[in-house]
């Protein structure tokens, strides 16, 4: 199991500068959560215990403001900024949380690990894992792409990906409550890179590949499966949407940035002893990744 080194301080400064001035958004905030409320949530996040959160009545802009305040603090605990994640990609997910469109959050690199991992089952207050896909940015031109084939020109690689999220909040949550928590991001596991080929064949493979989630302790029981086109009709449509949203927010993508494109399979709750395998059939070399969830550890609560 490998843990990546920190990214440059320059990238961390880019995030901090954006947040300090709230320069990433031009909209005025009506009731941005107080710093003390954000600090209270962060203290619970670090301990891995449930939090009160920011309340169900947050407006879209107030939720974004809370997200940026929280993101300013998260590098102390999760390492440097590694990229951005997309959530509420499917219509079902948006209906569940009352979201009108996809939403995005920040990702950090300290808990970004490779291929095979052993993770404590209680890695968060309300831990979940899901099958996902990420792309690695080649240049900022992705925001100008209009088709999957055009998008490939601005990407270096794609990678199967398992996100480790932590809802932190008990009970049903609104879309804005989740946005304020940086969309529950806590960590992730990725497979080796699949180099991008700027061809229609490669673009088609990204749309038609099938991901299967298997439980190795249950004789390979299938926990879920999906095609790539569950992500906004094509995963690269999701990538383009996210790049445009980031540009609108004043964020310029850099080479090496990672974009998480949303859940392919409904998130699952980990249990101690689970051995999960994700198979991505139809992608070049049909990559896989594995994770074992170990016994819970004592957080000293």
Where are these regions (language model features)?
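Bacterial N-terminal signal peptides that target proteins for export
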Residues: 2-16
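Sec/Tat signal peptide C-region and signal peptidase I cleavage site
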Residues: 26-30
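Catalytic-core "active-site belt" of small-molecule-metabolizing enzymes
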Residues: 31-234, 287-292
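Short, charged beta-turn/beta-strand-edge "cap" motif at the junction between a beta-strand
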Residues: 265-268, 282-286
